[in-house]
Design a protein with these regions (language model features):
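Acidic, polar-rich low-complexity tracts and alpha-helical solenoid repeat scaffolds
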Residues: 4-6, 16-308
């Protein structure tokens, strides 16, 4: 009887000492807080290993947290991009519908764009994130539009920017989207007039936006490209009032004025010449009459040479 009681007590003790995935998760979080990332990674991996064969809803929740925690340690604490990308992808494969997966897609998109220049991969991740209708959808739409612009797919960039402006008309990203739309149109051949209208639309809808001055500068550039330097200067002078880089705008103005000067015939537009107030014209030089004058002698010396 005593042996049976002892055995039961031992089993109870062993059961109480058994570590759970939640225990490892807590230890991992403590290690992160205490700046011990290597130890945190060990604990996160132990939690994942214990949960690997358990597909219950609670297990999936813990697994997603463990994988997200490990990926964040690789990226945020150790700056190990390759390892972070691998674990974020593991999270997406095992727990695609978890809240952590949404965050992982957004982070993964940035890593793919910045560190691998995989712009299409980044677009895929953001597009998948948008299917979840996250609260930051307007921002993600804008990021997608910018990525298409970086790819040189200006038509798709214009389309994505339009979608943002239509679906999220009260978002803080609408003026950014309209400016990007105008830039995309500007980059497409044969659509200069449409681009100018798009910039003007931004100025009309958001006159107090910091992008309004940038739109004015771009309208001036379009005028200059069309050879309308005077109109370009008018727009640039207007932009000087609020543009964050007035030196850049002044440079545009100076270059346009030089182009005007280089293409204007001499004396045209000069007030003194137009009203006859300039210096009198120089008389034409008299051709030398003798060989003495030809080499620089005076008329008097020439006459003496000939015995005059």
């Amino acid at each position: 009887m005593k042996r049976l009681v002892l055995a039961c007590a031992l089993l109870a003790l062993l059961a109480g000492c058994r570590e759970t995935p939640a225990d490892h998760l807590q230890r991992a979080r403590d290690a992160v807080f205490e700046k011990r990332p290597d130890e945190a990674l060990v604990e996160y991996r132990k939690a994942v290993d214990l949960l690997r064969r358990d597909d219950t809803p609670q297990s999936m929740v813990l697994r997603a947290r463990a994988l997200k925690g490990a990926a964040d340690v690789y990226w945020l604490e150790q700056r190990k991009v390759k390892e972070a990308v691998s674990v974020y992808k593991e999270l997406l494969a095992q727990c695609p519908e978890s809240p952590e997966a949404l965050e992982a897609r957004i982070i993964l998109a940035e890593l793919l764009r910045v560190h691998y220049r995989d712009l299409r991969g980044a677009i895929d991740q953001l597009t998948a994130a948008l299917q979840r209708n996250p609260p930051q959808s307007a921002e993600l739409h804008y990021q997608v539009a910018k990525l298409y612009f970086e790819l040189g797919d200006y038509a798709q960039s214009e389309l994505e920017a339009n979608r943002l402006a239509e679906r999220f008309s009260t978002s803080a990203y609408v003026d950014d989207a309209l400016f990007l739309r105008a830039q995309a149109i500007h980059m497409m051949e044969g659509r200069r007039q449409e681009a100018s209208k798009a910039y003007a639309d931004l100025r009309a809808r958001f006159p107090d936006s910091e992008l309004a001055a940038h739109a004015t500068v771009e309208m001036g550039r379009l005028r200059a490209e069309a050879g309308e330097n005077e109109k370009a200067i008018e727009l640039w002078v207007e932009a000087l009032k609020s543009h964050p880089d007035p030196a850049l705008v002044q440079d545009y103005i100076s270059r346009a004025r030089r182009r005007i000067a280089d293409t204007t015939p001499g004396a045209i537009g000069e007030r003194a010449a137009a009203f006859g107030h300039g210096p009198p014209p120089r008389p034409p030089a008299r051709a030398p009459r003798t060989s003495v004058e030809a080499v620089g002698g005076t008329a008097e010396e020439a006459s003496r040479d000939h015995g005059d």
